[in-house]
Amino acid sequence: MAQRHLWIWFLCLQTWSEAAGKDADPMVMNGILGESVTFLLNIQEPKKIDNIAWTSQSSVAFIKPGVNKAEVTITQGTYKGRIEIIDQKYDLVIRDLRMEDAGTYKADINEENEETITKIYYLHIYRRLKTPKITQSLISSLNNTCNITLTCSVEKEEKDVTYSWSPFGEKSNVLQIVHSPMDQKLTYTCTAQNPVSNSSDSVTVQQPCTDTPSFHPRHAVLPGGLAVLFLLILIPMLAFLFRLYKRRRDRIVLEADDVSKKTVYAVVSRNAQPTESRIYDEIPQSKMLSCKEDPVTTIYSSVQLSEKMKETNMKDRSLPKALGNEIVV
């Protein structure tokens, strides 16, 4: 009786082992954002396949083998136009991968003999890494020796990214080195890597501390802050001085206008020549002269000017030539 139970247990164990062997271990799949990924089924006897059901959180697609081509029914809208089945092998291809496509996928392969083989896949989606950026900071110490910190980073925060440095082989995104003027220039290369891509960049360090005062990037903000504070004080001061200058200039212009309005200008022509006022008086002869000519007698007489003419004479005293009054007889 005990021997019979042992045989039954052995048969059950063998059956369970065969069933477990048909279900492959979960496979890890790495996909690249925007590209495609292929889920390999490795079906040994395609002709025995009745149908294949793909699921990921919910139903994805249903494949029914046909005479010439498999019939594919996409049951989830987000995969429409992006799923393809490779004929005769029934491998599933997803194109134009998105970040939300990551997750667990399960394929239930149903054979004609009503046996089901299940395969499970874990899909991860990654971006291709761009060239990393290396930043350098240093602190000077005695004897022109400085401690240099090199930091390597990628453009965006990415998962599963590892960093390494050459020639030292440091496995970190930060590299600490000590450099002195006696050291030769060295080139340090940072390599960033994720499961689907890798990228690298290099920097050369050549006498960074020679005749260089102590420097640390954290204190680099201080001069910039002082410059901003200086500008905040200088700009309002310049604006105030300009406004004061403009107000004073306007006041001077107004005073000049008032003075010009009160000033009377007279125009004197230099070419004007004064005219002489002369009064002529002619004395007729009472008698006919004889044949013997008598000497001509000339009489000069002074004429008194009237009050009106005196006033005119007083106004014209400034002229270069005084007016004369002469009577010729």
Swiss-Prot record:
Gene: Cd84
Signal peptide residues on this chain, from the entry's feature table: 1-21
Topological domains annotated Extracellular: 22-221
A GO BP annotation: adaptive immune response
Lineage, top ranks: Eukaryota, Metazoa, Chordata, Craniata, Vertebrata
InterPro entries cross-referenced by the UniProt entry: CD2/SLAM_rcpt, Ig-like_dom, Ig-like_dom_sf, Ig-like_fold, Ig_sub, Ig_V-set
Glycosylated residues (UniProt): 147
Organism in which the protein naturally occurs: Mus musculus (Mouse)
Keywords: Adaptive immunity, Autophagy, Cell adhesion, Cell membrane, Disulfide bond, Glycoprotein, Immunity, Immunoglobulin domain, Innate immunity, Membrane, Phosphoprotein, Receptor, Repeat, Signal, Transmembrane, Transmembrane helix
Topological domain spans for side Cytoplasmic: 243-329
Motif ITSM 1 boundaries: 263-268
Protein name stated in the entry: SLAM family member 5
Modifications the protein undergoes after translation, according to the UniProt entry: Phosphorylated by tyrosine-protein kinase LCK on tyrosine residues following ligation induced by agonist monoclonal antibody. The association with SH2D1A/SAP is dependent of tyrosine phosphorylation of its cytoplasmic domain. Phosphorylated on Tyr-280 and Tyr-300 following platelet aggregation. Phosphorylated on tyrosine residues upon high affinity immunoglobulin epsilon receptor aggregation in mast cells. N-glycosylated.
